[in-house]
């Protein structure tokens, strides 16, 4: 009798797909960071939870009737200024400065949230917790992913557990 042992490559593929998305997210946030420094203007990184889309917007210098800064989508010919995240990544928590934006909508779902990148290059404190349903663990649950944004270099660090 012979036995064949085959490695499980499906988990590696899920890791690669997830890491590719996170690399794109880091590139997008880095673009906002660089442009905020170069243009000396406020930027925001917008997460549209309904469309599963992340985009960068730049302040116009104008204010609305309530005194809030007006923003327009950042346009670049050489880089993506928005990306979609895959359906299998389910955002569970979206902490900005310690407050979970996913809990903001009373009786409904949070549709959109964002964090700022100031002209000096600093970002707000951001932590994103998600599950990856393409990466099922031995216990039958989706893999946990924690992303913590470094406010000084505008890059997410990846953890294999939820963070706060």
Predicted regions and their residues:
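N-terminal helix-rich module
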Residues: 4, 10-14, 20-23, 34, ...
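Phosphate-interacting basic helix/loop segments used at nucleotide- and nucleic-acid interfaces
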Residues: 27-37
């Amino acid at each position: 009798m012979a036995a064949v042992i085959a490695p499980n490559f499906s988990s590696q593929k899920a890791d690669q797909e997830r890491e590719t998305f996170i690399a794109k997210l880091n590139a997008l946030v880095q673009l906002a960071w660089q442009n905020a420094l170069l243009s000396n203007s406020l930027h925001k990184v917008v997460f549209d939870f309904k469309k599963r889309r992340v985009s960068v917007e730049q302040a116009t210098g104008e204010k609305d009737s309530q005194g809030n800064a007006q923003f327009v989508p950042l346009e670049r010919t050489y880089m993506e200024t928005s990306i979609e995240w895959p359906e299998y990544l389910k955002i569970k928590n979206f902490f900005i400065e310690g407050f979970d934006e996913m809990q903001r909508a009373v009786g409904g779902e949070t549709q959109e949230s964002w964090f700022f990148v100031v002209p000096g290059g600093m970002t707000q404190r951001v932590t994103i917790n998600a599950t990856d349903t393409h990466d099922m663990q031995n216990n039958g649950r989706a893999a946990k992913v924690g992303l913590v944004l470094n406010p000084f270099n505008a890059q997410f660090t990846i953890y294999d557990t939820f963070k706060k």
